[in-house]
Amino acid sequence: VEMAAQAAEARGLKSALISVGGNLRAIGTKPDGSQWSGGVENPWNASDVYTASSSYVSGVNMSDMALVTSGNYQRYYVVDGVRYHHLIDPDTLWPARYFDSVSVLSPDSGAADCLTTGLFCMSLEDGQKLIESLDGVEALWCTTDGQLVTSSGWSSHEKK
């Protein structure tokens, strides 16, 4: 996604919103000058992967920014009543169990994609420390017990 955005910008594109799976990348602002909008799907009320959902836990305004989400609610399979998703904890070699989804806002879609996967596999405390150490990067965690936790600057991007 980031490479597509960079190629488009190199060819003079000033305004676009690229959407690929759970990755959004805004180039500039809308033609009218307003910011692009993105949403973080509610993982506790997510519809089937093939059906559009209108339930969001957060909406954000973006320009020259990426919004990427990783979650356990769309890519999974069930064996003997147990759901296994695709985000594997490198310490246990089993699906990570800290969160239902993690979203990252970053100027770089590739970095945001890496961060969502990494944050999904680490404790909230460690993830918060990491995000707060990065300039221009914010995160939203949807915990397995139904809480929303955000980094210190997430609210400055939220739609009012």
Identify what each model region corresponds to.
Residues 1-160:
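Mature catalytic core of soluble alpha/beta enzymes
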